[in-house]
Regions:
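HIT superfamily nucleotide-processing domains
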Residues: 1-212
């Protein structure tokens, strides 16, 4: 079995997350021109990894992307947006499959690929400002998701949070996207992306694996 995030012990994964957060904070502190640091993990070749070894990447950017800027403006108009359109809606649709005192995990919707979402419940929505218990709560659910999906599923782990220059509430959340299909000509021409696993089926797959 390949050494993926899911094959770590919970403690190892927590330290891995902590190390990533420390690097994230350090980049902001060491370069005043950085406006956003994107954090991601590509697992296996189909998900963009050059080598099949575990690693996270942090990229400093001197601006906020158009997509993120639009999302932040939506959150400014509706401060409860992430509850209305994500966590609460997932609850109404019975898509939540794991929760602890500090975070909640659910089968997400609206993505090109089957996606698991893990949202922090912490009031402070920058990872480096959260308590060790809050970080561990996030880490435990992210680790559980990786363990449930196994090491043979190519995926992208993407981090989202409030950058220092933004003054609105953006909860720290992590998306794990299963890169199990390859968009081709149909998707390019129609802009219709066929997702072969619906959120409820994805939820059931993960729940079954968590019980094993």
């Amino acid at each position: 079995e390949k050494a993926s995030s899911g094959t770590m012990t919970p403690e190892m994964h927590y330290q891995y997350i902590n190390f990533t957060i420390a690097a994230l904070k350090d980049i902001y502190l060491s370069n005043r021109y950085v406006r956003y640091v994107t954090v991601f993990q590509n697992w296996l070749n189909q998900a963009g990894a050059s080598f099949d070894h575990l690693h996270k990447q942090l990229v400093a950017i001197d601006g906020v992307s158009a997509s993120n800027a639009a999302e932040f403006e939506m959150a400014r108009v509706n401060p409860n947006m992430y509850n209305d359109y994500a966590v609460n809606y997932a609850g109404y649709q019975n898509l939540v499959f794991a929760e602890n005192e500090y975070a909640v995990a659910f089968a997400d919707f609206g993505h090109r690929y089957p996606t698991l979402a893990i949202y922090s419940k912490a009031e402070k929505n920058q990872p480096w400002n959260q308590t060790p218990e809050q970080v561990r709560g996030m880490s435990d659910l992210v680790h559980a998701c990786h363990a449930a999906m196994g090491s043979e599923v190519p995926c992208n782990e993407e981090w989202y949070y409030r950058p220092p220059a933004i003054d609105i509430a953006v909860p720290w959340h992590i998306l794990i996207k299963w890169r199990i299909s390859n968009p081709a000509g149909f998707e390019a021409v129609t802009k219709i992306f066929v997702n072969t696993i619906d959120p409820w089926t994805l939820r059931d797959k993960v729940v079954n694996r968590l019980f094993e």
